[in-house]
């Protein structure tokens, strides 16, 4: 299934990082904080925005922003471009 966000929105895929305690115990998903890093999967219409984001960029976003959706058993978030705080550059 292909999803294209409308307006100044992005479709992002959260980057899950494995969390361990200092003792080396891996925390289950229910104990982890919501991720704030993601990879951009699709871009809506950003013509009126001064943001330079393209598919494949990695971004940091506001913790509780966007709408979570599930596509073919994968978790995604549709988010307003204003909720993107930073672009991660390699």
From Swiss-Prot:
Q: What is its main location?
A: cytoplasm
The answer, when asked if Chaperone is one of the entry's keywords, is yes
Q: Which GO terms describe its cellular component?
A: cytoplasm
Compartments, record wording: Cytoplasm
Molecular function in Gene Ontology? ATP binding; metal ion binding; protein folding chaperone; protein-folding chaperone binding; unfolded protein binding
Q: Which SMART domains match?
A: Cpn10
Q: How does it assemble?
A: Heptamer of 7 subunits arranged in a ring. Interacts with the chaperonin GroEL.
Primary role: Together with the chaperonin GroEL, plays an essential role in assisting protein folding. The GroEL-GroES system forms a nano-cage that allows encapsulation of the non-native substrate proteins and provides a physical environment optimized to promote and accelerate protein folding. GroES binds to the apical surface of the GroEL ring, thereby capping the opening of the GroEL channel.
Q: What is this protein called?
A: Co-chaperonin GroES
Organism from which the protein derives: Thermosipho melanesiensis (strain DSM 12029 / CIP 104789 / BI429)
Organism lineage reads as: Bacteria, Thermotogati, Thermotogota, Thermotogae, Thermotogales
